Structures are given as structure tokens and as C-alpha cells.
């Protein structure tokens, strides 16, 4: 049981790091080319959706394994 929660904490940490890296790249790209901010925004939303989807699958598996 404790190992399941530890794995969930690691998955949550991975999601946080991935979202931080995504936002870092977005801000760097927006600083270089402000004209493409609308395109970057749609890609950012899609990227965050995939990252959060991976976390939710991990969360469901942790409850199923429990």
C-alpha cells in the first residue's frame, strides 16, 4: 500500500517536471518569435493534456493495483 502511494508521488513529480519543461520551452519560443504565440498556445494546451492524461492513467492503475 505504501509503495503504491510512493509510486503515485513519483508520477506526480514527473508530471510537474514535464509541465515545467513545457512552459520553459514555450516562454523561450515566445520570446524569440512573438508572432507565433497563438500557435504555441494551442500546442501547449495539447501537450499539457497529454501529460495530464498520462498522470491520470497512472492514478487509475494505482487504485486498481491497490
Curated annotation (Swiss-Prot):
Record note on quaternary structure: F-type ATPases have 2 components, F(1) - the catalytic core - and F(0) - the membrane proton channel. F(1) has five subunits: alpha(3), beta(3), gamma(1), delta(1), epsilon(1). F(0) has three main subunits: a(1), b(2) and c(10-14). The alpha and beta chains form an alternating ring which encloses part of the gamma chain. F(1) is attached to F(0) by a central stalk formed by the gamma and epsilon chains, while a peripheral stalk is formed by the delta and b chains.
NCBIfam families reported for this sequence: PRK13467.1
A GO-annotated cellular component: plasma membrane
One MF annotation (Gene Ontology) recorded for this entry: proton-transporting ATP synthase activity, rotational mechanism
CDD domains: ATP-synt_Fo_c (cd18121)
Major localization listed first in the record, in broad terms: membrane
Keywords of this entry: ATP synthesis, Cell membrane, CF(0), Hydrogen ion transport, Ion transport, Lipid-binding, Membrane, Transmembrane, Transmembrane helix, Transport
Membrane topology: Multi-pass membrane protein
Protein name: ATP synthase subunit c
Taxonomic superkingdom: Bacteria
Location within or outside the cell: Cell membrane
